[in-house]
Amino acid sequence: MEHIINIAWDDEARVWYAICDSIPLALESNSFDALIERCKIAAPEMLELNNQTASPCRLCFRAERRENIA
């Protein structure tokens, strides 16, 4: 099964956050790379806690960051 994890930048809080409704998962971090690693650790744990099969499992990360430049 594939789980899509949406990652976005919160400019006000100055953090990256990740949300996945199918796992369920909601995490945040100051570092994009650290957030990816946290997701890879937390996803199987959350799947197990919610009695979902953790394996085989694929995570698809979709990231977005918007900036005002003018």
PLM feature spans:
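Short strand-coil-strand connectors
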Residues: 1, 21-23
